[in-house]
Amino acid sequence: MMPSSLPRQGGAERLRIIRIYLCTTLILLLAYGIWYAGVWPGPLGQDGYSLIANINQSAPRYTGKDPAWLLYALATYGLSQRVEVLVLPLLLLQVAALARIIGWIYVRRYPITATALLLLVACTPHVLNYGSSLYPDAVFSLAFVALLFEIWLILGHRRLSTWSIAWLAILFPAACYFKANGIIILLPMLYLAIRLKTTSRWVIVAIVLSWSAAIQWGGTVANLGHGHGALRPLILFETTNFMQTRPMNLWETRHMVTDRTKEIMHRYISQEDIDSLYDRDYWDTLWHLNQDRVRFREMSRIDFRHLRSDFFTYNLWRNIPAFTASRINIFLASALAQGGMVGPDNARHGLAGVTTLSTYNPFNLSSLPNTLNEIYETSYNWRFVLWSPFVGIILVLLVFKRALQERHLDELVISSTLLLQLGGIFLFSIAAEYRYLLAFFYAPLLLFPIRFIQQNRDPLPCQKCPRSRSTRQPVTSTP
């Protein structure tokens, strides 16, 4: 967590930096430790319940999760049969990543910004709740943002340090492979490798290739599959949307999908179930639930190939209004946290349905669990303000705009990566889950430094821009 170039600082300054990082780490450890003690072993949710149940049955691939997350779960919960063994290392990683960024900001003498990010981002009840749960979204989102932060620092100095190499190696697998949309992080990693000199470039390549090969090999050996991906759920969910019965029964709306699409879909779900089981906010009713009535899991490769072809050649274009409305609805329902939520005390009842060595509240704390529930519920009632990802989204747009105006390639790559992530979430989400947008709640940790804390900058020459606009006074900083 500490800068790599501490030896080059004066003695008093070195002590100041050490104190800042230690204090930040201790505050975060205290906050996360108290929270986890009150929710031990952590909220399960439907995904956590499925993960534990399938690992217990030696069938983790049927969770539909990505191989990297399943490998981690097998190496922790699978070997110990304890949920806390899975959660605690992730909590420590989150504390370390947050202390790294917030401490860096404080060292640059922005105490108000650092304190605001500590209180309004790092230690908010919903972040603590997701961070201690069996969902990979919190650690994935934070790792994604923290890895972009490290890339930004390295690009500012055009060199790798021991600390930066360690951070890249630690954060990369979670940021890239814990969820399918993490693959986007390969773009800034590739850009970083190109911008660095030969030796450093090969270090980046080695980190990417070694982790990628290890996860691919582990997933193959453990027969973990490839998850359900993003395209299949989208096509099935939206095709069901397009096939909803229209009460007006207008002539113009009688052929909203191809005859072949109707034939394929009706092999696996009846029209009555298409009308009754479709939920505009969730695809769970078509996949995870009602498997006696919806047999999409049994769909043959040939049928899905034909369905995919019809979707992109006719069905999508015939239903642009319905598709756009569906995308906007799910995105806004997610951003406003109007979907399902897992409370802090979820494990109280969730553990009863699975076989595990973990127990709820093993410390027999009497008031802390109830207090945390009350804090969480109060925060939830103000979620439209306190949980809003729109601050991060606005900052992404501001940084992207400035990068275009100043033709600053480094910032353009960083902000474009987040915009691609946002576009992917908008286009491919099939459930109104707030956790999908957690990366943009974390985004101010990265974007406030980029937007407001000057870093060594080397903008591309722009003949149309005044020199004073594209050149800034550098501030000495260490990665």
Q: What is each stretch, according to the model?
A:
Residues 37-51, 60-72, 80-84, 304, ...:
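Extracytoplasmic catalytic/substrate-binding loops of multi-pass membrane glycan-assembly enzymes
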Residues 129-139, 178:
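Short acidic/glycine- and proline-prone juxtamembrane loop motifs at membrane-interface regions
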Residues 81-85, 89, 323-415:
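Membrane-interface anchor segments at the N-terminal boundary of transmembrane helices
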Residues 88-108, 142, 146, 150:
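Transmembrane-helix motifs of polytopic, lipid-linked glycan transferases
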Residues 226-359:
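Membrane-proximal stem/loop segments at transmembrane-domain junctions that anchor or position
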Residues 56, 139-157, 167-172, 188-189, ...:
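Specific aromatic-rich, kink-prone transmembrane helix
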Residues 67-71, 79-99, 130:
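Loop-to-helix entry region of an early transmembrane alpha helix in multi-pass inner-membrane enzymes
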Residues 164-179, 207-214:
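Membrane-interface alpha helices of multi-pass inner-membrane proteins
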